[in-house]
């Protein structure tokens, strides 16, 4: 059974909470008596390196790998499961020690993850779950979705029609939808009149939100499952001549912060994540597993917090 553990959103507290005594390159003996290999090489696979969220995650893992003295390689999955399958096979051929994976498809990546484990690679899922991974670190995405939709509902006065820009079939997106559903269940006067999959991207969200607004021109709000989706929805609303729709997202990205800093923007709130911390914590967990130690918790949840135009001045943002 997996145990969930919540980390404070600072690197220091995260590492302390995990008690990562294994963060060295020393070879130790595990319970079976076999010597574990050193962590000399680390790979990171993400859905889309063009997304600033994953660029921040890349920064976190790179810094942690350099602190270990390990070589580091990051790969862009380009939102394509087949690409990620091929990348895992390439990492297997390279014989890397640790693979941190942000899966395009949490279930579909399972066989490739198993191949990596069979080849002796330690695999930890980051930001989204991945079938057969040995551990997972992610934002508390149920909380993130709930906070974003609660903010939206409050700002539209607790009643009205809304649209949802959904995303790819990953655990993080599914959990955000679950959290939003919890907020909606507590507010029966709010009804969802349209839901479409924006593939987590701004351009796709722009197109489908334009179509949904044509069909439902009187909506009061839009929830985007991530900030690129919410930003695309914001542009669609602007192009449709709207000015009073409330739009919320999830991420706390630099682009969202910039958009929300305008008092006239319809983008009103985002549930913040800490991608840098997610990446560095995932590597810390992998090092501990590689050393033969048992994790206190094999699923770690990092809390989210809501950011609005009124709280931007105290929001630290991504690094």
Residue ranges and their predicted role:
Residues 2-9, 22-319:
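A residue-level marker of the well-folded mature domains of exported/periplasmic proteins
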Residues 11-14:
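Repetitive helical segments and hydrophobic/amphipathic motifs
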Residues 17-20:
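Bacterial Sec-type N-terminal signal peptides, specifically the leucine/valine-rich hydrophobic h-region
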